[in-house]
Amino acid sequence: MRTTRVMGVGALIVGTGSALPVTPAQQAGVKRTDLQRHDLGVPGREVVQVRVELAPGVAFGKHTHPGEEIIYMLEGSLEYEVEGKPPVTLKAGDVLFIPARTIHAARNVGRTPGAELATYVVEKGKPLLTLVQ
């Protein structure tokens, strides 16, 4: 009986995860963990929270999001290149706002893993992340 319940909950979690818009495959040294996704009171908009971890020396290339991104650094230090601005290095406790559809990239400039809590306020139903050449 207990096994059935656990399997049922597991199927629900897997089913819920598969409904999320597809993001690029995990890159070596980069781990993205979807934490939550909720509709907003504004039609066609949703908020998404993701924990993003980068191993030391790893970079995540240029990309955009279909809405605003607010970054809160949890640990380590990451350098961000945001289109039209000088590079900025964030450490634990720092925050960064990235406007909608702004090209940006990140890399871990430290000797320890870097982790951020990324909060996105985006257009519902669009891919959360689009890589840029």
Which residue ranges define each predicted feature?
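Glycine- and acidic-residue-biased ligand/ion/polar-headgroup-sensing regions
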Residues: P66-G84, D94
